[in-house]
């Protein structure tokens, strides 16, 4: 079903080309880039998953990752939560429709969705083998904010934290873009929080590039917890 621009009480509003290109973007947390879970609206009007917000509030002087204003505990985004419960999207595997609140649990067990992901990964691998010059470099990365480059993953995280912590520009994550499932055109609205939450570990240590992203993330989370 088509998604309509939401008001300030529902969360960050998309309009124009951005809304048309990503009609479900208003249901996506700018930190974890997943459909909101227990969405909470903070005083500046932006919305985060409850768990993501708790992480963002940990620094001594927390700021909103979207607008960089002072961050404070928010209130439950009841209207947005209602819309997530009532808005449908389709599974790319079985093509059945599900409410946004149910789609994440569904794709975790849908064999057709797993096949869809594997076909995409295999196609990417096949194309890369035919065009070796286009194989992404997964060892060093450029900074998406400035001309600096040749960072390893940990170096890029540290550089962005030290140099670009107040930069509000939406940028493409070079680490995600290098993955077989990565979208080189997807711009994170909150790259600093994203890179700190999703890329504190080394993909080369944990990742089997022959599996899909869902399985990969589960493996990474399990192994990273064991290493703590």
Curated annotation (Swiss-Prot):
Modified residues (N6-acetyllysine): 102, 112
Zinc finger (RING-type) stretch: 29-68
Gene Ontology cellular-component terms listed: cytosol; nucleus; plasma membrane
EC supergroup of this enzyme: transferase
Catalyzed reaction equations: S-ubiquitinyl-[E2 ubiquitin-conjugating enzyme]-L-cysteine + [acceptor protein]-L-lysine = [E2 ubiquitin-conjugating enzyme]-L-cysteine + N(6)-ubiquitinyl-[acceptor protein]-L-lysine
GO terms under biological process: cell differentiation; protein polyubiquitination; spermatogenesis; ubiquitin-dependent protein catabolic process
Pathway given in the UniProt record: Protein modification; protein ubiquitination
Stored SMART domains: RING
UniProt PTM: Autoubiquitinated. Polyubiquitinated in the presence of E2 enzymes UBE2D1, UBE2D2 and UBE2D3, but only monoubiquitinated in the presence of UBE2E1.
Regions crossing the membrane: none
MF (Gene Ontology): ubiquitin protein ligase activity; zinc ion binding
InterPro entries named among the record's database cross-references: Di19_Zn-bd (IPR008598), RNF114_RING-HC (IPR042716), RNF_E3_ubiq-protein_ligase (IPR051438), ZF_C2HC_RNF (IPR034734), Znf-RING_euk (IPR027370), Znf_RING (IPR001841), Znf_RING/FYVE/PHD (IPR013083), Znf_RING_CS (IPR017907)
Database matches in Pfam families: zf-Di19 (PF05605), zf-RING_UBOX (PF13445), zf_C2HC_14 (PF18574)
Zinc finger residue ranges, C2HC RNF-type: 91-110
Major location category of this protein: cytoplasm
Keywords of this entry: Acetylation, Cytoplasm, Developmental protein, Differentiation, Metal-binding, Nucleus, Spermatogenesis, Transferase, Ubl conjugation, Ubl conjugation pathway, Zinc, Zinc-finger
EC number, UniProt record: 2.3.2.27
Record's subcellular location: Cytoplasm; Nucleus
Residues at which Zn(2+) binds: 91, 94, 106, 110
Function: E3 ubiquitin-protein ligase that promotes the ubiquitination of various substrates. In turn, participates in the regulation of many biological processes including cell cycle, apoptosis, osteoclastogenesis as well as innate or adaptive immunity. Acts as negative regulator of NF-kappa-B-dependent transcription by promoting the ubiquitination and stabilization of the NF-kappa-B inhibitor TNFAIP3. May promote the ubiquitination of TRAF6 as well. Also acts as a negative regulator of T-cell activation.
Known partners and oligomeric status: Interacts with XAF1, the interaction increases XAF1 stability and proapoptotic effects, and may regulate IFN signaling.
Protein name: E3 ubiquitin-protein ligase RNF114
Species for this entry: Sus scrofa (Pig)
Lineage: Eukaryota, Metazoa, Chordata, Craniata, Vertebrata
């Amino acid at each position: 079903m088509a998604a309509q621009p939401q008001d300030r009480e529902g969360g960050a509003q998309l309009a124009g080309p951005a809304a048309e290109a990503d009609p479900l973007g208003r249901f996506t947390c700018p930190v974890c880039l997943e459909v909101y879970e227990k969405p909470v609206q903070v005083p500046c009007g932006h919305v985060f998953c409850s768990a993501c917000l708790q992480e963002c509030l940990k620094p001594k002087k927390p700021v909103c990752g979207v607008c960089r204003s002072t961050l404070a505990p928010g209130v439950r985004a009841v209207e947005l939560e209602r819309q997530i419960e009532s808005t449908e999207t389709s599974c790319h595997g079985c093509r059945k429709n599900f409410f946004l609140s149910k789609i994440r649990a569904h794709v975790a067990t849908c064999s057709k969705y797993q096949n869809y992901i594997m076909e995409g990964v295999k196609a990417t691998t096949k194309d890369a083998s035919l065009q070796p010059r286009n194989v992404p470099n997964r060892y060093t990365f450029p900074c998406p904010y400035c001309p600096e480059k040749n960072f390893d993953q940990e170096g890029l995280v540290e550089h962005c934290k030290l140099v670009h912590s107040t930069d509000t520009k939406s940028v493409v994550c070079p680490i995600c873009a290098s993955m077989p499932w990565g979208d080189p055109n997807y711009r994170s609205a909150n790259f600093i929080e994203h890179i700190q939450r999703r890329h504190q570990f080394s993909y080369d240590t944990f990742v089997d590039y022959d599996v899909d992203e869902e399985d990969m993330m589960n493996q990474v989370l399990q192994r990273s917890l064991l290493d703590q």
